[in-house]
Amino acid sequence: MTIAFQLAVFALIATSSVLVISVPLVFASPDGWSNNKNVVFSGTSLWIGLVFLVAILNSLIS
């Protein structure tokens, strides 16, 4: 169970890092938002899901 928690935390950190870099780039590009809207929403949905997964796994470990 601990390894699943560690992998979920790593995935959350990796997704956060990717979103921190990619979202400003999407907004800075001329047609970025209209072309990459689905990618931003998918990444945000993945991030929210990982937050809940880490919270659930944390409650099971503690």
UniProtKB/Swiss-Prot annotation:
What Pfam families does the database record attribute to this sequence?
A: Ycf9 (PF01737)
One BP annotation, GO: photosystem II stabilization
Which cellular compartments is it found in? Plastid, Chloroplast thylakoid membrane
| InterPro entries referenced in this protein's UniProt entry, alphabetically | PSII_PsbZ (IPR002644), PSII_PsbZ_sf (IPR036512)
Residues annotated as transmembrane:
8-28, 41-61
Q: Does the keyword Cytoplasm apply?
A: no
Keywords, ordered alphabetically: Chloroplast, Membrane, Photosynthesis, Photosystem II, Plastid, Reaction center, Thylakoid, Transmembrane, Transmembrane helix
User: How does the protein's chain sit in the membrane according to the entry?
Assistant: Multi-pass membrane protein
Q: Would you name any one GO CC term?
A: photosystem II reaction center
For this chain, the family text in UniProt reads: Belongs to the PsbZ family.
Q: How does it assemble?
A: PSII is composed of 1 copy each of membrane proteins PsbA, PsbB, PsbC, PsbD, PsbE, PsbF, PsbH, PsbI, PsbJ, PsbK, PsbL, PsbM, PsbT, PsbY, PsbZ, Psb30/Ycf12, at least 3 peripheral proteins of the oxygen-evolving complex and a large number of cofactors. It forms dimeric complexes.
Its biological purpose: May control the interaction of photosystem II (PSII) cores with the light-harvesting antenna, regulates electron flow through the 2 photosystem reaction centers. PSII is a light-driven water plastoquinone oxidoreductase, using light energy to abstract electrons from H(2)O, generating a proton gradient subsequently used for ATP formation.
The name this protein carries in UniProt is Photosystem II reaction center protein Z
Task: Give the source species.
Answer: Sorghum bicolor (Sorghum)
